[in-house]
Amino acid sequence: MTTKTRFAPSPTGFLHVGGARTALYSWLHARANNGEFVLRIEDTDIERSTQEACDAILDGMNWLGLTWDEGPYYQTKRFDRYNEIIEQMLDKGTAYKCYCSRERIESMREDQAAQGLQQKYDGCCRNLAPRDTDEPFVIRFKNPIEGSVIFDDHVRGRIEISNDMLDDLIIKRTDGVPTYNFCVVVDDWDMGITCVVRGEDHINNTPRQINILKALGAPIPEYAHVSMILGDDGAKLSKRHGAVGVMQYRDDGYLPEALLNYLVRLGWSHGDQEIFSMEELKTLFKLDDINKAASAFNTDKLIWLNQHYIKSLDPVYVASHLQWHMDDQKIDTSNGPALTEIVTALSERAKTLKELAASSRYFYEDFDNFDEAQAKKHLRGVALEPLTLFNQKLSELNDWSVENIHNVIEATATELDVGMGKVGMPLRVAVTGAGQSPALDLTLFLIGKERSAQRISKAIEFVADRINS
């Protein structure tokens, strides 16, 4: 049998990290078993579902590279199929119409609560004969009264729920819209899903859905219910912890490889290994190795992974992601070095691509002012001679290379009988406007001869004005 998994988000908000991790686990289980991965949009909550949220989910999945083999399917386009199955269930007696008013249901629950009983539907309409009436009704699934539901969860082991703990689930509301728990069952059946990977908040739904599957004569998939992600304070991850949509991580400068690597380790491990490529994960990942304990989100660990991938991935690939940030920060990359050169030069220092983009601006744009603190420290009167001499030697340099630039810096220091720092730091501030950059010879090379000379001349004027003021 072909392994077939699915990710089935509701488009009522962005794709958050918990959902992304669930999608990743489901995707990996399919890929590890040469199976198929289905994307399904569960949009039966018509009032809360939005196209914007749906687009955000698709964008997030695409950015992460979690490609799907089927879909996206939309539940709102399958209402005819759900209604067809409901009619069959009514005919077979595995579902029934319930005419109980909202007031009666509320009164029933209040009585049950007062008696310390479990609050569930009492089956008032369960055995009523069909009647011709205009009264509003819902349709309920006739849940078995005896026995229990037993299933072996990949994460939590054997789970058993007595049927007398389950009530007769509403599968179609008074407005004619089929309910989530029912649509999920029909979809998983029709789509041939063999393993359902989802959050632990769905555990209570599972026995209900299994009973409906049994009533339909449908195969029962395997299940894996993964634990929630916590904030560093032990509470459920939420916006106050900085929990955001997946695309916000893109906007903040993270590579998809870093986020995927981080998410897979939030609950799954393979020895002490921390770094995993997607190809490795396709071989190593097993649902049974997922830890059932909740995992805490650690932003510092994510940053560490991001730094690793910025430094270790192909600069051409990193540059393709960096371009988005350059555009976002309105840096025109046509007026300067190739982005791959920037990645190679700056990757050792950068924590995020957003930071890398911001720190590379001086390679593409001239600046109006020098950093005040750096200028005060390094663009003093003593800097005038090394700046002037270097600029003179620079004009005589025909072969513009890192090695030759380095030789000119050394020659300037030697001729003036000063340390390299006495030449290097004024030059660095002169050409970058600040005090940090890659190696000075590489920095000058990437900025270019003409632009470097212009900036050094500007610094010479700045120092001269400072001396004369």
Curated annotation (Swiss-Prot):
Transmembrane segments: none
Catalyzed chemical reaction(s): tRNA(Glu) + L-glutamate + ATP = L-glutamyl-tRNA(Glu) + AMP + diphosphate
CDD domains the record matches: GluRS_core (cd00808)
Pfam entry (one): Anticodon_2
GO MF annotations in UniProt: ATP binding; glutamate-tRNA ligase activity; tRNA binding; zinc ion binding
InterPro entries according to UniProt: aa-tRNA-synth_I_cd-bd, aa-tRNA-synth_I_codon-bd_sub2, aa-tRNA-synth_I_CS, aa_tRNA-synth_I_cd-bd_sf, Glu-tRNA-ligase_bac/mito, Glu/Gln-tRNA-synth, Glu/Gln-tRNA-synth_Ib_cat-dom, GluQ/Sye
Family: Belongs to the class-I aminoacyl-tRNA synthetase family. Glutamate--tRNA ligase type 1 subfamily.
Protein name: Glutamate--tRNA ligase
Organism: Shewanella frigidimarina (strain NCIMB 400)
